[in-house]
Amino acid sequence: MSFKISSLALAVATLSTVSIANAAGLDRSTQPSWAFTEEGTFAYVEHITIDPTIEGKDNANVATTDANFTAGRNVPDMADDYQFLNFGAKADVNDTISVGAFFDQPWAADVEFSGDNNFVGTPTAVIGGIYAQAAAGLQNAGIALPVTNATELQTAISTIQNQVTAGQARLDAANTQLATAQAALAANPALAPVLTPQITALQQGIAAGTTQVAAGTQAVKTLSTAQAASQNLSKVTGATNVSVSSQNFTGLLGVKLGEKKNIQIYGGPTIQRLEGDVHLRGNAYKTASGYDANITRDTAYGWMAGIAYLKPEIALKAALTYRSEIDHDVNMTENLPALGAAGVGTNEITITTPKSVNLDFQTGLNPTTLLTAKARWVPWSDFAIKPKIYGSASGLNLVSYDDDAWTAEVGLGKKLSPQLAISGAVGYDSGAGNPITSLGPVEGNWNVGLGAKYNLTPEWAVSGGVKYLMFGDAKAKIPDGSIVGDFQDNDGWVYGVRLSYQKK
């Protein structure tokens, strides 16, 4: 049996493109290998729009464990709409060799919190916690001074500093008296019965006074550190927001093997650019509130390789593709207000974007019907960003994931006429863990979608797809594991439009 339904395959391909557009972690676009295995000369440009809605509640306990999470204030939609462009072209040099070049945007994030909740504004509860910690420290040291606000903190510092100054003056006087008594005793040992008790008493008093002055000095230092942190945190304004973007340029060379040229191996280099900004605000992030980080644009290199089995007469195609991880040695500029001047600096760190494996399959069921299936694996559990200043202060990663992500999709397409084909698909994304980072609080998704392709001419066609995403409920956590939010019953839409050219 032989039947040509390549136009139908393209309709399903457009739908598949939008299916990956809000996957786990920072995943935004699939590998371009699907286009490289098209027949003949093929070129395309596509525009993808992601429109998620992710709302929830913050933690009324500010930051604690999942066991005693208490739903607090509303967190309005924190996921910004995101749009990106992909394009590429491939050509057959002869019946054996193919070449292609592709641009896609594989990793991205666009997050911006708003409203009145723990992800927005000055971290007043965190500042209050600093005052409480300072008061507890004084109490443990046997110093009875209240510290519940900035004024009382300054009063405590001034009071203890005055006591330290007075104590040091008494120590200086006692040391002078001790030196005089010791000199008198040395000059006239007969005075020992009188001077020895005095010298002993002075030495004991000096020892006790030295301990008290040292304790007071340490208390002033500790309180001054708390004061600096609280003052810096009190200047924090705005809302938590994150922006990460990437661009991939991939060149592929393919060779067909076998008597019928139905096995193709392909591979080539990838050039990837990565940049981003992170801004943490509000009580949720504890003393990291106010943290800013800028990831300067970096270009690094990787590779892609795969193997495909092709049987065009029944529209059969099975392809396994691997895209390598890529190490970016980026300059990251940080500002952690709680540390004052020590929290500002620029350092080089390595960010490794993850590898991925795609399995794509399609086959014609009859002359007008196409079955597709695909799976994708991304080891997000290996991914982490640990800035130098943030990591040194906390000992933690800024962003990381607990689980690897698996996605799967099954679709059917139907050719209605020589010009028009439609398709539908159902998909699943496992997500990358739950609880998960507060910068992407969903646990995967189930999705359904529709796609269509219309042939404008025998070579030119326009395709479109729309997909509805039902996000899994997730608890949001910060790097120390504290649960800071609960996000339930969220969804999203993804839209894709593609213009393509194909000449066999």
Give the location of each predicted region.
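Outer-membrane beta-barrel porins/channels
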Residues: V93-T96, D104, A108-K504
